[in-house]
Amino acid sequence: AASGENTIILDAGANATVSITPAKASLFPAPSDIVVLQAEIPERANAEALAWAHSFGARVLLNLAPARPTDPALMARTDILVVNETEAGLTLGMPAPASPMEAIGVARALRGLGPKHVMVTLGADGAAWASGSEAGHCPALTLGEAVDTTGAGDACVGALAAAMALGKPFDEAVADGIRAGSTAVLAPGAAPSYAALPRVTRA
């Protein structure tokens, strides 16, 4: 778009048939692992994957993108919830937050639905987060000229999950996610623009 934001067209196709059977047959999560789920597959598959991951003691990150009505029981059992500001508003049935301060309140409200940790991404305004009784705002980073925003959200989620798996506190993991997303926009494409973990994490 002229604003510099990307436009995404989704055709569910094979996503609608996703099953966790292959994962059950070949993957054995460790308690330190983070299993990442997202909303482009059936909620039934996500619910099964969450139960499977928890049976190994692993934690589950749900990236509720695109936003859709979600079973309260699934939300309550989610360890880490990641949404953008539009998805946050839709999930709560309210307008998207208009400022980082409003977004902190929204993150707290989403935390009240059950997830232990919540990140609300705000594009050029960084992200708001809530974890336990704490909440805050992580500013965006400008590392250079933005070339292509495609995949920035996925890079952010991946780095957040990796940082959590390494045992980082949630606010530091959010900062790593922001840095990964900010790095991803510096080059065209999705996966080719992703940076290796050492480049996006802070010691």
Report the location of each language-model feature.
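Active-site-adjacent beta->alpha loops and helix N-cap segments on the catalytic face
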Residues: 41-47
